[in-house]
């Protein structure tokens, strides 16, 4: 079951076998000397060219690979370690630990190419997944086993929200998380590791990195590596897992690079013709079964802010909720900078979340929308020109806006305020009181960066005492 390399075109390598034809997605291995060190390279079969020749995609840099070099067929697809042993470690696409903390002694290895759970095993019940973040739980609640898109530009706090969610899941649901860094910056991956170490959530999370500098094969398949680890926790251990993908756009982007390298005819905007199938194959595996669930949060980069671009458009079809981060909110110093009017959720339905929650959420959105409409008048004529009713709307809206902020556990290091987890009941109760005017006489500053309403009242008393 050995073959010889006959052609090397960057990350695409053709291999000839004499009496064996490897299957599509089968892993092949080759070892060679490069710069005085022995290197191991894993290739994944992408196409069968006939005459026992296969075209493969390299899972690492192919420098030093020469024609005539021997390649061994493994008879199986890429296998990665799964189970509790993977927690607290960093892996590359082929499941090797890259954090210099020794090999991973995993008892089980699974293939990264798996079928989605069959229909009869999928769970159909809709449950709200409580995150402890007020603005998310109130206005765009996540569903257990659902998919959330996290949209935002650079530096508005996508990664901080991701870390807070990992922290809250580890704390409240004592669950595990898997983080797949798909084609993002090495520096960010490094920062994330050390920040998690500092905020003590590292032992509850497995990290899989395929950074920007990797060849397209590694950047594409890393999403499957992370997902496989999450599936083990769901299927074999019956857990509710959180799966983070940062960034799902890079999954589509690397797929398009691979497709071009394999000589396939491109479709719209130069993307691969199989874009929606590839996206579907990944997303279909992220689901709830009768045993456990995978709730996924996917950061989505939108190229040139064009939501109709085929890559983000192919993600939209799969999402249950969107959390949109807005720079203008971050500039006001309100964190998390979630846009309360732009974020949506399939769960915001009175039949799922109940009448009370639904009415409070819609009430909050109405007041904020009215405030937004009045902002032009305020900017030109000032507050004094508004009617009494409008003044009240503005006052309440400003309090609501402030109350949508909250201190995070993972940001404690640089804000100095201890993080809070706010239960859904407390969240609904607080905003209901604000809408009913219970807190009209309180100081606006009392609502900024607090958890529940009791904290705001205590803060207000402190301000008044001064």
UniProtKB/Swiss-Prot annotation:
Reaction catalysed by this enzyme: ATP + H2O + 4 H(+)(in) = ADP + phosphate + 5 H(+)(out)
- Supply the name of the protein: ATP synthase subunit beta
The entry's keywords: ATP synthesis, ATP-binding, Cell inner membrane, Cell membrane, CF(1), Hydrogen ion transport, Ion transport, Membrane, Nucleotide-binding, Translocase, Transport
Where it mainly occurs, coarsely classed, is: membrane
Originating organism: Sulfurovum sp. (strain NBC37-1)
Partners and quaternary state? F-type ATPases have 2 components, CF(1) - the catalytic core - and CF(0) - the membrane proton channel. CF(1) has five subunits: alpha(3), beta(3), gamma(1), delta(1), epsilon(1). CF(0) has three main subunits: a(1), b(2) and c(9-12). The alpha and beta chains form an alternating ring which encloses part of the gamma chain. CF(1) is attached to CF(0) by a central stalk formed by the gamma and epsilon chains, while a peripheral stalk is formed by the delta and b chains.
Gene3D superfamilies in UniProt = 2.40.10.170, Bovine Mitochondrial F1-atpase, Atp Synthase Beta Chain, Chain D, domain 3, P-loop containing nucleotide triphosphate hydrolases
| Membrane topology recorded in Swiss-Prot or TrEMBL | Peripheral membrane protein
Gene name linked to the record = atpD
Organism ancestry: Bacteria, Pseudomonadati, Campylobacterota, Epsilonproteobacteria, Campylobacterales
């Amino acid at each position: 079951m050995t073959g010889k390399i006959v052609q090397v075109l960057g990350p695409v390598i053709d291999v000839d076998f004499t009496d064996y034809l490897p299957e599509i997605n089968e892993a092949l291995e080759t070892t060679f000397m490069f710069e005085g060190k022995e290197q191991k390279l894993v290739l994944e079969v992408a196409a069968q060219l006939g005459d026992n020749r296969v075209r493969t995609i390299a899972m690492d840099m192919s420098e030093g690979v020469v024609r005539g070099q021997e390649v061994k067929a493994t008879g199986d697809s890429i296998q990665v370690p799964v189970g509790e042993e993977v927690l607290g470690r960093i892996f590359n696409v082929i499941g090797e630990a890259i954090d210099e903390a020794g090999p991973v002694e995993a008892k089980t290895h699974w293939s990264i190419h798996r079928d989605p759970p069959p229909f009869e095993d999928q769970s159909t019940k809709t449950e709200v997944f409580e995150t402890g973040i007020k603005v998310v739980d109130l206005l765009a609640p996540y569903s257990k086993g659902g998919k959330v898109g996290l949209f935002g530009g650079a530096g508005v706090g996508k990664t901080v929200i991701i870390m807070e969610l990992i922290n809250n899941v580890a704390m409240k649901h004592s669950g595990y998380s898997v983080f797949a860094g798909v084609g993002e910056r090495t520096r960010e991956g490094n920062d994330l590791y050390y920040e998690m170490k500092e905020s003590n959530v590292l032992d509850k999370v497995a990290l899989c990195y395929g950074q920007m500098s990797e060849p397209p094969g590694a950047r594409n398949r890393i999403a499957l590596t992370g997902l496989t680890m999450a599936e083990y926790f769901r299927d074999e251990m019956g857990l509710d897992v959180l799966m983070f993908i940062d960034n799902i756009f890079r999954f589509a982007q690397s797929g398009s690079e691979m497709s071009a390298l394999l000589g396939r005819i491109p479709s719209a905007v130069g993307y691969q013709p199989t874009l929606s199938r590839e996206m579907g194959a990944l997303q279909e595996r992220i689901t709830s079964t009768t045993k456990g669930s995978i709730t996924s949060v996917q950061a989505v980069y939108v190229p040139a802010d064009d939501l109709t671009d085929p890559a983000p458009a192919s993600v939209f079809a799969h999402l249950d909720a969107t959390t949109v981060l807005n720079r203008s909110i971050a500039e006001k110093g309100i964190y998390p900078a979630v846009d309360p009017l732009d974020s949506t959720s399939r769960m915001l339905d009175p039949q799922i979340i109940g009448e009370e929650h639904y009415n409070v959420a819609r009430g909050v959105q109405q007041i904020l929308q009215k405030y937004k409409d009045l902002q032009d008048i305020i900017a030109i004529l000032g507050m004094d020109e508004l009617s009494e009713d409008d003044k009240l709307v503005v006052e309440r809206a400003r309090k609501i806006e402030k109350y949508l902020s909250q201190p995070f556990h993972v940001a404690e290091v640089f804000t100095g305020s201890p993080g809070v987890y706010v239960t859904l009941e407390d969240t609904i109760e607080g905003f209901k009181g604000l809408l009913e005017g219970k807190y009209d006489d309180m100081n606006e500053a009392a609502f900024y960066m607090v958890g529940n309403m009791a904290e705001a009242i205590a803060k207000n008393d402190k301000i008044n005492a001064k």
